Amino acid sequence: MLKSLIHGAALTELLIEGHNPYARQKLNTETADALRQHIHTPDSLLAYVCGREVLAGSGVFALTQEKFLAYHAATRTVSTVAINQIRQAQAVRGKYGHTVRIHTESRTYAMYGADKSLAGAMHQALLARGITSSFEDKSPRGTLWSAYSGSHPSVDDCLLDARQRLLAA
């Protein structure tokens, strides 16, 4: 109950407005440290999205030049898939923000509550790597969230910060 009162505005934004206020954020230290273990020079980050994994809690999907990484915050683990094993990707506006699905040869990774702009950046990065990707360019259902959500860093700021932090030793 107390968490509902503390995070009430965020829950309203997510459930009613269809916008996840935590979706466009810079990577936290724990996530950056976990992803860094799987990214080695000359590989580099192309894009990432933050959101909620289906039945698994919060997470991050990251795309590098060589692989797709899924960071699972609940278990603090990273799943890796070679980029040539990705069959297709989708980013569609769902009930709680954008839903990103990455279909690989062995399974489908799904995340909801992703930021539209970060999902768009991932879509562009996948297309540039020759992977079939679709992107639904629709905004959240409501627009009231922008009045009380506060400012968010730009997509370019998020990606630049993540690239610098993932290269740090």
Pin down the residues of each PLM region:
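Canonical phosphoinositide-binding patch of PH/PH-like domains
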Residues: 103-125
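Terminal and domain-flanking low-complexity segments
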Residues: 2-7, 118-169
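Anionic N-terminal interaction surfaces
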Residues: 1-61, 103
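Phosphoinositide-binding peripheral membrane targeting modules
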Residues: 48-105
